[in-house]
């Protein structure tokens, strides 16, 4: 069995909708394999939502003009292509826009139904004159990739309903590069850097996660041919290894006071793993193990990034440890007596 070191994935946030992801170390050659697969999946296969058709009052086709509206219908449709929406519905849903009087018509004037959100309300759609009026229906559907207006035109399309081009992908741009990185004495490992920029409807980290899920599902088809086929196994992450080591640590290595250690030992709690499986009440039920002993244990566990089973967040270990003074037995006196 060949075991490769588990790569780490870190995120560097450039702005709210752009992040840079670093995956390293990868076996030689896998940087380009993974980078190209992720890029193509991110650009083509991340689910999203888009407007698929519109209907404007008193307008029959896209080559019309609208009384009191500066832009013609074609310009309005072009502006709507910049609309960023998300939908929780699998079926098509309808949004409504109604505006009258002089001024700009923006995406903020759209009234979406429950489960649909407009993410760029400042988008300008049209300009109205004093007597201008614009009433419109917008159909939103979920999908992926790009679908042309011709494809969106249904066989039973009603008169006045105009199909539009739909850009479902919430990912705007993806670039990647592969650099060399070092692991111990070897310098030929790959370091993959992926730069992802998205629309406001999705975060870059969620887009990466979606692409990873899609690729795992697809590559799983090949694995089903022989689930026992030999390949490169990925080793445990450093975090998992450290956690396993911490849980196996003997309680005596926590350097507790003699009273606390003896109480735990008498209860049969010998490792940190056994300790964190207990609640505060479980420990308080131990004879001569009081509230101060609880605080001492919690402080030691917090230093390791661990906690008791039901410990509330916000515990201050420094304040608790300051109350103990020196490490000798007299510095830690319980209210209970032997």
Curated annotation (Swiss-Prot):
InterPro entries, alphabetized: DNA-dir_RNA_pol_insert (IPR011262), DNA-dir_RNA_pol_RpoA/D/Rpb3 (IPR011263), DNA-dir_RpoA (IPR011773), RBP11-like (IPR036603), RNAP_asu_C (IPR011260), RNApol_insert_sf (IPR036643)
Coiled coil: none
Keywords attached to this entry: DNA-directed RNA polymerase, Nucleotidyltransferase, Transcription, Transferase
Disulfide cysteine pairs (residue numbers): none
Gene designation: rpoA
Domains as described in the record: The N-terminal domain is essential for RNAP assembly and basal transcription, whereas the C-terminal domain is involved in interaction with transcriptional regulators and with upstream promoter elements.
HAMAP family xrefs: RNApol_bact_RpoA (MF_00059)
GO molecular function: DNA binding; DNA-directed RNA polymerase activity; protein dimerization activity
Residues passing through the membrane, by range: none
Reactions listed under catalytic activity: RNA(n) + a ribonucleoside 5'-triphosphate = RNA(n+1) + diphosphate
GO biological process, one term: DNA-templated transcription
Function description: DNA-dependent RNA polymerase catalyzes the transcription of DNA into RNA using the four ribonucleoside triphosphates as substrates.
Record lineage: Bacteria, Bacillati, Actinomycetota, Actinomycetes, Propionibacteriales
Keyword rRNA-binding: no
Chain intervals for the UniProt region annotation (Alpha N-terminal domain (alpha-NTD)): 1-226
Region (Alpha C-terminal domain (alpha-CTD)), start-end ranges: 240-338
Quaternary structure and interacting proteins, as annotated: Homodimer. The RNAP catalytic core consists of 2 alpha, 1 beta, 1 beta' and 1 omega subunit. When a sigma factor is associated with the core the holoenzyme is formed, which can initiate transcription.
Protein name as annotated: DNA-directed RNA polymerase subunit alpha
Gene3D superfamilies, alphabetized: 5' to 3' exonuclease, C-terminal subdomain, DNA-directed RNA polymerase, insert domain, RNA polymerase, RBP11-like subunit
Family affiliation: Belongs to the RNA polymerase alpha chain family.
EC number: 2.7.7.6
GO terms under cellular component: cytoplasm; DNA-directed RNA polymerase complex
NCBIfam families assigned: PRK05182.1-2, PRK05182.1-4, PRK05182.2-5, rpoA
């Amino acid at each position: 069995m060949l075991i490769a070191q588990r790569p780490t994935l870190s995120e560097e946030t450039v702005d709210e909708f752009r992040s840079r992801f670093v995956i390293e170390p990868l076996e030689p050659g896998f940087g380009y394999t993974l980078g190209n697969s992720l890029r193509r999946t991110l650009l083509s296969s991340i689910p999203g939502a888009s407007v698929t058709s519109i209907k404007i009052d008193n307008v029959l086709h896209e080559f019309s003009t609208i009384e009191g509206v500066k832009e013609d219908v074609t310009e309005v449709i072009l502006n709507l292509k910049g609309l960023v929406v998300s939908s929780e519905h699998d079926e098509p849903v309808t949004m409504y826009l109604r505006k009258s009087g002089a001024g700009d018509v923006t995406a903020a004037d759209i009234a979406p139904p429950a489960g649909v959100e407009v993410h760029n309300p400042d988008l300008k759609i049209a300009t109205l004159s004093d007597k201008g009026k614009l009433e419109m229906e917008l159909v939103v559907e979920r999908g992926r990739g790009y679908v042309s207006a011709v494809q969106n035109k249904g066989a039973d399309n009603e008169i006045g309903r105009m199909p539009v081009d739909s850009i479902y992908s919430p990912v705007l741009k993806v670039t990647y590069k592969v650099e060399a990185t070092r692991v111990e004495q070897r310098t030929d490992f790959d370091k993959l850097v992926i730069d992802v920029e998205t629309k406001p409807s999705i975060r870059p980290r969620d887009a990466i996660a979606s692409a990873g899920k899609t690729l795992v599902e697809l590559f799983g088809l090949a694995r089903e041919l022989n689930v026992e086929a030999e390949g490169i196994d990925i080793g445990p992450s450093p975090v998992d290894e450290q956690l396993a080591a911490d849980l196996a640590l003997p309680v005596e290595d926590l350097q507790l006071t003699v009273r606390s250690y003896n109480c735990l030992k008498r209860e049969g709690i010998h490792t940190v793993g056994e300790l964190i499986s207990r609640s505060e009440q479980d420990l308080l039920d131990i004879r001569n193990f009081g509230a101060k002993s609880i605080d001492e244990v919690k402080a030691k566990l917090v230093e390791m990034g661990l906690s008791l089973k039901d410990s509330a967040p916000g515990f201050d270990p420094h304040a608790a440890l300051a109350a103990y003074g020196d490490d000798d037995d007299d510095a830690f006196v319980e209210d209970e007596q032997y």
